[in-house]
Structures are given as C-alpha cells and as structure tokens.
Amino acid sequence: MDTILRLSHITKSFPGVKALADIDLEIARGEIHALLGENGAGKSTLMKILCGIHQPDTGTIEIDGTARHFSDYHDAVAAGVGIVFQEFSLIPHLDAVDNLFLGRELRNRWGARDRKRMRHAAAAIFARLGVAIDLDAPIRALSVAQQQFVEIGKALSLDARILILDEPTATLTPAEAEHLFAIMRELKRQGVAMIFISHHLDEIFAVCDRITVLRDGQYVATTDVARTDVEQLVRMMVGRRIESSFPPKPVRAVDAPRVLEVNELQIERGGPVNRFTLHAGEILGFAGLVGSGRTETALAVIGATRAHRKDVRVRGAAVKLADPADALRAGIGILPESRKTEGLVTSFSIRDNISLNNLGKYRSMRWLIDRRGEARTTHDVMRRVGVKAPSIHTEVATLSGGNQQKVVIARWLNHHTSVLIFDEPTRGIDVGAKAEIYGLMRELTARGYAIIMISSELPEIVGMCDRVAVFRQGRIEATLEGDEIDPDTVMTYATAGTRGATHEPA
C-alpha cells in the first residue's frame, strides 16, 4: 500500500475526559477512507489533531514517511492537509475567486492584486473538479452544493493532498450528493487521499474503499468496504446489535381527536392552497424533494413566515397564529432544522436552554427565579427524554448532536405543548442516537402528543410515519397512509405528481 498518512498511538485528554486512547490510522494515496463512529466517538478530535487545531498528548503524525508536528492549522495546510468543514468557512458577500485566495492574493510586479491571474487559477481548479461555478457571483447567490464545491476548490488551491470531508452531504439533495461523489472519484483518480465522515452508511458503501471505526475514543477496527455490511458496521459503532432503528407503528385509533386542522393555507397570492389535519397520538410526515415547500408550510402555520391566507384550528378552536409566540401559547412547538443556530443557545447550560421559553413558571417574586424549582423540573424532563450529561449546568455546546436534540424536545415538554414539529430531526446524528430519537418520538405519541415530522430521508418517512403528506412544488400532492406508505409511492408523488390517490384521509 502506498501510504501517504499514518497516525500512530494518538492519545488526547481534556479535563475529566479521555477523548482518544492509542488511535492508529493509515491512509493510502488515492484512497477514500471512511471514518465512522457515534457522536462522541472521537472522530472530530482526531481530525482536529490532524489539522493542527489540537495537539496530541502522545503519538505521531507521518506524511509521506516524514514525522510532522502541527502547532496550528497553517502548519497542517503547509504539509498538504485540507479540510471541508460541515459548516462552511466562506465569506458570503465575496465571490468564489476572492474566497479561494483570501489572505494569499496573487500580486503583479507592482504589488497590486492580480485579479486576472486569480480568476484564471480559480477557473482551472473548478475545471479540475468538473463543476461550473459563476466566478463573479457572491457566495450567497450560489446553491449549497456550489458552495460545497467552492470549499473543496479552496482546499485544492492550497495543494491539499489529504482532504478531510466532514459530513459533506448533510445539506445536499440526492442529485447534488451524486455530483459530489463523482468529484471525489475524480480526485481519487488524481491521487488525492480523502477521509470521509458521514452518518449515512449507504454513502460509505457507494464511494469509500476502506472504513475505520472508533467507539468511545478507542480504535475498533479497519476493514475493506467489500468485506463488511451495514449490520456489522452498526454493531462495531455502537457495541451492540440494533435490531431495527424504527419502533413498531401502533394501530391508529379511528376516534383520535384532531388537535390541529389547517383548513386553508396559501403562502403566496395565486399559489397553491394546502389543507391537512393532525390527530393526537400520530406522526404525520411531510415528504418531498428539497425546495418542495415542506418547511415553508410548517413555518407559515406557526406564524414564523407570512401567509396570504390561513385558517388554523387547534383542538377545534380557531386560532390566530401571527408569530411563533402565538403558536407556543396554542401548544405548538418546533424543533428547527438548524438546532445549533435556531433551536439552542449553545453557550448556555442545559438548564437555561430548557427554561428559556418558560421563565415565568419559576418566578418566586416579581424579579426572582426559583432556582431550586427550575432545577427539579430540569432534572425531571432530562430524565424523561434521556439527556446524557454530567449535570444540568453542562454547556449545551459540549453535548453530542443527539443530546442537543433531546434538550430542544425537553424544552417543549417543559412548556406543556401538545403539537411538536420535528424538522429534519436526525440530521447529523449517529445511528444509535437516531434510534433513541425515534423511540422518544413514539413515546411522546403514546402519551397523546401529535407530531409533524419533516424529513429528507425516505427510510425515516416510511419507517416512522402513520400518515405522509407528499409535497411537490409547494402543493400537497397526496396524503398516504397504511400500505400506501412505501418508497416508490412517495417518490412518485414527490417527482411526478398526483396519480389519483386520496388527498386527505380522515
């Protein structure tokens, strides 16, 4: 094997936590190598060591057989290591050329920025990737996929020979993800080594050569993709066998009360008019392609965005939901797609996040908060949803994705909501945590909660939902239930429109 990167006996500890224990990793030139593990397994810490962001307590890094010590990120870049973070590091108002050469602009002989040379170099990089990018458009005007390609181009412009891709498909459509995989295969052909981090095991099998699994900061195994399967990988990641990610669906009660009725919703004048109902104890899925109107519909219902016409009833009573505060008073909570920026204050503690929308509940005097009562309630809802953390004072930023999602759920339970909207509830969450979230959702519906689940993952829609509203171009094309909920039927409606099924079963 033509080894380009070797990490040997890497150990790293933080106060009270041993993040990595004697980790080995070996990558070949021109190899796409998957790094797998649950959240908290040590993947991010190991990659931050490789990028010079953290320094190991013990262990060595070798590139092309030469031992390297990275004091910071710039040392790693100089050695040929590049990383494309899940959260982009691009400047939105600058174009692709300026983003590629930010801080290292090419100069002419008079010392002025040589825009022509930089533009030519940028065009050559994107030609190497086989992508078309408008070099003069600001980054904010590009699609998410195009921004991803600019990030990759930025790493390649720094002569990266080892490229780390951290959850690169998290915000891409299936077609965009396939385009990314084509780019990865081309870079592989050119000899670039890639470390691919993803929670989507189907992607691992589609594009990777070998897999290394970490668990609880320890090395578990390295195996060829061709010699393993999904069940074996899951067992290696979580240390146990997961029989099924999805809990069994309960028999739907025919007399379950309607807790939410959207009798008329038109977001824009002249646009489609949608109607749907939600019953106590059920999960209603919103399915469709990215941009089909699923999230837009949910946001319009709760008043987060304006609607041209809207008629909403909660438990039979007409309500005016002009903003999310109105929705909250009506008992509707939302777990937004971007939990870190919209659902949580990550610098706050678990206690403060759970109490955030309900501080009046703990007011002991006019301006004082009953901290003991707040702590008791926080402990209670943490136990109910299964948040794993050392204390209620733990900063939310230090939690895994699955535990962060549970904190958002705990907040709404603390507020006595009856309708919960989950927008991409398992995005960026590992296999074991996904199963926990699914189980929690079913526990909530068993207690009478009603859930709307917006998801781009078809297996999730099919495995979790009692009924599914399929969106296409802003319109609910059909509402499916029972045996109608299968991948082929959902995708047919999402891509080709109505074939004559019932629009809104009772």
From Swiss-Prot:
Keyword match Nucleotide-binding: yes
Domain ABC transporter: 5-241, 251-498
GO cellular component annotations of the record: plasma membrane
Main localization of the protein described in the UniProt heading: membrane
Membrane topology value: Peripheral membrane protein
UniProt keyword list: ATP-binding, Cell inner membrane, Cell membrane, Membrane, Nucleotide-binding, Repeat, Sugar transport, Translocase, Transport
Statement: the UniProt record of this protein carries the keyword Magnesium: no
E.C. numbers: 7.5.2.7
Matching Pfam families: ABC_tran
Domain of life where this protein originates: Bacteria
Binding annotation for ATP: G37, E38, N39, G40, A41, G42, K43, S44
Enzyme class: translocase
Catalytic activity: D-ribose(out) + ATP + H2O = D-ribose(in) + ADP + phosphate + H(+)
Subcellular location: Cell inner membrane
Entry's family note: Belongs to the ABC transporter superfamily. Ribose importer (TC 3.A.1.2.1) family.
Protein's name according to its UniProt entry: Ribose import ATP-binding protein RbsA 2
Gene: rbsA2
